[in-house]
């Protein structure tokens, strides 16, 4: 059987990668077709390897060879579970440092040496530590990332421990930060964020109070285009996020829990209106609670007053108890339709 030359196989694998560059791939079977497919497709196998507990240690051993390690651009250890140790993760990062662009951490095995190893990955654009179940001192994390000039995206671990000396160590090119863990009001108040920051997600921050949220949004809110706050935030009051429209006037995408907003959030929108285009209102709670939840009529009032002129996508939780046949919901649906918008009801 006549085989394609390696150059053709190279283009075939490039095409397969292009479907989703940020998804781990396993094209191992294609490498076995012939020698040309192996030579032409090796870069695709290592570009974003599909790692699991069975192949992880073999992969780390394989990339000890210099020609191979340069092929790795993306690493996800989400499926490695507890197979990774800090020393192995550190070795992995050092070996793949040349071209590594994204890194998703494991549930465990990200100690001091691994955090420091980030400093060698000068092309890193994204770090996701959202599933890490170990306590991480941000002093060591920031020590590894503060000089990464291309880092745009980072999600902090749920068990992060802030350090006062890190408040001025945020990388200069960040566009997205996922805040979580033991962040305090004082830490956020003293932090110096880069002007490039455009999108944030706040969740699982048990120490943050209304004052911390207000301080953070007062500082970075005008620059944000996307704001997402997720339940639980146990120290936030019922009105803890009422300031979000005022402090984030340019955010076009907003997702907030009804647990922390009241009708004041919409009443306080300036008469000049807000730029939000996509608004999601989630709710984690029971309808049997004594909490007075926002009503559809609160949004109706804001729309009638022209305060939400650009709202084209509205999504709310079915748990809010807004009955579709009620007059206020019907009015809300009609007003959104008049703006050529769409409405979604979710279970969140």
Swiss-Prot record:
Molecular function as annotated in GO: ubiquitin-like ligase-substrate adaptor activity
GO cellular component: cytoplasm; mitochondrion; ubiquitin ligase complex
UniProt keyword Mitochondrion present: yes
Annotated localization: Mitochondrion
Keywords: Mitochondrion
Source species, domain of life: Eukaryota
GO terms of biological process kind: proteasome-mediated ubiquitin-dependent protein catabolic process
Primary location: mitochondrion
rRNA-binding found in the keyword field: no
Family: To yeast YDR306C.
Subunit structure: Interacts with skp1.
Name of the protein described by the UniProt record: Protein pof5
Organism of this sequence: Schizosaccharomyces pombe (strain 972 / ATCC 24843) (Fission yeast)
